[in-house]
Amino acid sequence: MNSVCFATPHTKHMDSKMQLTSSPASLWRPWLVTRKDAQTECRRTKLACPYSRPEVPGNTTTDGKMQSFQHPVRLYWPRSKSFDYLFSDGEALLRNFPVQATINFYDESDSEDEEESCDEDDESDVEDCLKHNSHFTAFN
């Protein structure tokens, strides 16, 4: 293994250059966006998509690309398929979805008859409530 070491005299000019390059402000950190980077990205975005919606803060990745989603990501899955989720469909869904997401189950109605029966139940509840209110006001 061969190695070479060069020695040069130390000058004041070199000292000032070292201070400039070793200062914390001059270190490039890809996760920090500088004002210059933000202005350049803003100009590029306005030129490429002049009629686009304004950017949501925190909706960009470190490389400046726009995300097509906003965290927290919720995927809605019908409760009737929750059994399928526990085995294969849900695993495949989360595997193919490129971000961390949670699956939220929701109740779905299979027919309009259920909706009509709910409406009838609501009307009967209102009538019962009115009967109780009239009952209480009669004694007062």
Curated annotation (Swiss-Prot):
Its main location: nucleus. Belongs to the ripply family. One of its GO terms (cellular component) is nucleus. Named after the expression pattern, which decreases in a posterior to anterior direction in somites like a ripple. It comes from the Eukaryota. It holds the Pfam family Ripply. This is Protein ripply1. It comes from Danio rerio (Zebrafish). Interacts with gro2 via the WRPW motif. Keywords: Developmental protein, Nucleus, Repressor, Transcription, Transcription regulation. It is found in: Nucleus. InterPro entries: Ripply_fam. Transmembrane segments: none annotated. Expressed in the embryonic anterior presomitic mesoderm and in newly formed somites. The gene is ripply1. The ripply homology domain is required for transcriptional repression. The WRPW motif is required for binding to tle/groucho proteins. PANTHER family: PROTEIN RIPPLY-LIKE (PTHR16770), PROTEIN RIPPLY2 (PTHR16770:SF3). GO terms for biological process: embryonic pattern specification; negative regulation of DNA-templated transcription; negative regulation of transcription by RNA polymerase II; regulation of skeletal muscle tissue development; somite development; somite rostral/caudal axis specification; somite specification; somitogenesis. Residues 71-106 are annotated as: Ripply homology domain. A motif (WRPW motif) lies at residues 28-31.
